[in-house]
């Protein structure tokens, strides 16, 4: 009989920030594993607005179980310490093995490492192993000085019980609430309204698409409760820069959703649309496209970045892009506008014979469920 190892997780829970969601999905699967006795230490959120009331995780089915995990006594010997919060706490740690989760959207992690007031909190513990979510993101930690073998890529996953296709009747009902009829072709983007998400490029592309296809619509679901940047504000800024493109006619066909959605509501939103578009410049992983594909809709994604790790022709059309570097050394991919517009047009005109909903869902089921992803994590904890 195996003796359980004491696993202490230090991080966030109860909210819908991507790190907290990843953490909670992983914990749900790890709790099924008898190899671990799991403890949890809450790391403070960076701002009071990040709270369960305003930004609930939506994981009602197992949030209560996760909330019951407690902090260990000071006397307990910890075998494995796993940190998943921001900034990255690379110092100290009293455990046999220490792992820190982090992402490097721009392949650079300057100012992303925690600097505490205590002397021992100012130095990186060289025995720490880094877990990151994509090969693109891995580069940033290696550039910071971590050894390549000490940076392990474990991707994010999808809960296929939550994210799944909806039937025609449900799709019609949801679209009706959004004042969308069956003849409209709807593009969707779910993200924070920040430069790295490439929303300005998407807005310009949609303005061109709208001129050609009068029945096109765009839905922007922002994360303003977490990041304060609203889609409406981003649209306003982009309109000032491109007044002749973002006309009143174009703007009247852009639907903005700012309120928090439950995961069920988010899944239904994915399923009610016709395509998901992410013309991003820099991402650590980019979970929404994979969730959208699980809900049965095709995606259009920037080529060359983090999403290449889960590319499959059954659900991804690639936007051509050029890798560039900002003055501060941050790397990103600049998506090509014409390639983006072309892909959007091709979807509307159904020119893509490789796109297959059932093949897409099968691909995700074989490679990107949280059960599979968490197995990779637990194997690392045990065998490293």
Model-derived features: where do they sit?
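Short hydrophobic beta-strand element within catalytic cores of glycosyltransferases
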Residues: 298-301, 317
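Conserved donor-binding/catalytic core segment of Leloir-type glycosyltransferases
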Residues: 8, 181-197, 203-206, 218-219
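Acidic anion/phosphate-binding donor-loop and adjacent secondary structure
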Residues: 142, 158-177
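Aromatic "clamp/platform" in nucleotide-sugar-dependent glycosyltransferases that forms part
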Residues: 281
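A charged, aromatic-enriched C-terminal amphipathic alpha-helix characteristic of glycosyltransferases
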Residues: 335, 339, 351-381
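Nucleotide-activated donor-binding/catalytic signature segment of Leloir-type glycosyltransferases, i.e.
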Residues: 228-264
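Extended catalytic core of nucleotide-activated donor transferases of GT-like folds
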Residues: 8, 49-129, 135-142
């Amino acid at each position: 009989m195996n003796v359980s190892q004491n696993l202490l997780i230090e991080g966030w829970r109860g909210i819908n920030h991507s790190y907290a969601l990843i953490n909670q999905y992983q914990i749900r699967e790890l709790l099924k594993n008898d190899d671990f006795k799991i403890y949890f230490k809450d790391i403070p959120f960076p701002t009071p607005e990040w709270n369960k009331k305003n930004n609930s995780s939506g994981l009602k089915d197992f949030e209560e179980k996760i909330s019951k995990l407690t902090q260990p006594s000071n006397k307990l010997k910890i075998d494995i310490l796993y940190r998943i919060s921001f900034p990255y706490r690379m110092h100290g740690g009293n455990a046999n093995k220490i792992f820190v989760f982090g992402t490097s959207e721009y392949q650079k992690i300057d100012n992303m490492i925690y600097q505490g007031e205590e002397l021992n909190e100012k130095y990186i513990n060289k025995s720490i192993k880094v877990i990151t979510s994509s090969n693109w993101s891995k580069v940033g930690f290696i550039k910071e000085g971590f050894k390549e073998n000490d940076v392990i890529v474990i991707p994010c996953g999808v809960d296929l019980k939550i994210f799944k296709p909806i039937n025609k009747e449900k799709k019609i009902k949801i679209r009706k609430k959004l004042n969308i009829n069956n003849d409209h072709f709807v593009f969707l983007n779910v993200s924070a309204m920040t430069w790295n998400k490439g929303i300005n490029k998407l807005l310009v592309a949609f303005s061109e698409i709208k001129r050609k296809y009068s029945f096109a619509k765009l839905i922007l679901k922002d994360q303003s409760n977490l990041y304060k940047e609203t889609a409406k504000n981003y649209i306003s800024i982009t309109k000032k820069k491109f007044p002749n493109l973002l006309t009143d006619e174009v703007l009247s066909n852009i639907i903005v959703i700012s309120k928090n959605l439950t995961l069920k509501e988010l899944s239904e939103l994915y399923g009610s649309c016709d395509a998901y578009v992410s013309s991003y410049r820099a991402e650590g992983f980019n979970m929404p496209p994979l969730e959208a594909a699980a809900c049965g809709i095709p995606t259009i994604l920037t080529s060359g970045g983090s999403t290449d790790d889960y590319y499959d022709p059954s659900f991804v059309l690639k936007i051509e892009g050029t890798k560039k570097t900002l003055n501060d050394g941050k790397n990103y991919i600049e998506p090509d506008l014409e390639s983006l517009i072309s892909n959007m047009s091709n979807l509307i005109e159904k020119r893509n014979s490789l796109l297959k909903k059932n093949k897409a869902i099968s691909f995700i089921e074989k490679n990107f469920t949280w059960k599979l992803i968490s197995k990779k994590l637990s194997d690392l904890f045990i065998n490293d």
